[in-house]
Amino acid sequence: MEVQPRQIDNYIKSDGSSPFEEWLSSLRDTNAKTRIRLRLKRVAMGNLGDYRSLGQGVFELRIDSGPGYRIYFGQIASLFVILLCGGDKSSQQKDISKAIEYWRDYYERLKNSN
């Protein structure tokens, strides 16, 4: 299987905010931030690493650092990754619900723009 580079974009809410960027900038652990950014660089090169499907078009990247950080994303075809939000193991269920809500909103706006 050939590795395909992916374009990574952030989900932007209708109010202009980016839940993923807000979460990442709120992290105080600079080591974790660095590991997350490095992981996203590997994703952009086509290496998703440790991830799983959560259903309804949403996926979870697992980061082996700190309290078990998670990045939630959606994919369009196999080339575009949309970062929805992030969290850790303690807020996982709430974060998954938000990610599904954000993905539905993103997808609806995408369909309506065409």
Please provide the spans of the model-predicted regions.
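Basic, Lys/Arg-enriched alpha-helical interface segments
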Residues: 1-67, 77-81, 88-114
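Short, surface-exposed beta-strand/loop micro-motifs that present aromatic residues
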Residues: 70-74
